[in-house]
Amino acid sequence: KNMRYNLFCRQIETDILERKFIIINKYCTLDLHPKAKLVLNAPFIMGYKRIEGSKLESRLLIEENGRMEIKYGSYTVYYGADIQVFKGAHLEIGGDASVNVGLNLICANHISIGRWTGGGRNVTIRDNNGEHHISIRGYKTSIPIVIKEHVWLTENCTIMPGTTIEAGAIISARSVVQGHVPSFS
């Protein structure tokens, strides 16, 4: 599986000699549209397991013209993750970090996650509301999210559409965040 995705998959841009590759652990499902792109400028470890024998599945979906990019350093996603990049959306991850069990990352527009930004268990980041339309003038179903460098997203926090989290912030457990979070708060 790893050999096929790293050497023969046109949707994934890799260069093994320059440490730009994907490691897909057991019980991971990848669904990449023929016009999707996964750009790796560093190692991307999908579905990392600490408990030997666990069958908790991790999923990665990138739809038509969707783009996911690991920009700088190694990025590890633990098991139980659900990452979805919808049609025409762009997900940028800085790298040099990891996200624990149960990541739920849904990108319909644009999500940018800075370098050295990690997360605890069951973190949810979504830039959309599931295409539920509300009849309010100017209402948008998806708004970009920006999470800057050195941010820590703790257990069970949810980052909502339109959020900007400045560098060095710590988002506390079970928080629902929408709007602007200042640096080092």
Q: Model-flagged regions — what are they?
A:
Residues 136-161, 185:
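C-terminal segments of enzyme domains that contribute to small-molecule binding surfaces
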Residues 53-57, 131-136:
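Short, flexible, glycine-rich and Lys/Arg-enriched loop motifs at helix boundaries
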Residues 178-184:
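Gly/Pro- and small hydrophobic-enriched strand-loop and loop-to-helix capping segments
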Residues 163, 175:
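Short beta-to-alpha loop/turn elements within the nucleotide-binding domains of ABC transporters
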Residues 1-126, 148-150, 157-159, 167, ...:
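Domain-scale signature associated with acetyltransferase and cell-envelope carbohydrate enzymes
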Residues 127, 133, 179:
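Glycine/Thr-rich phosphate-binding loops of Rossmann-like dinucleotide-binding domains
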Residues 170:
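Short-chain dehydrogenase/reductase
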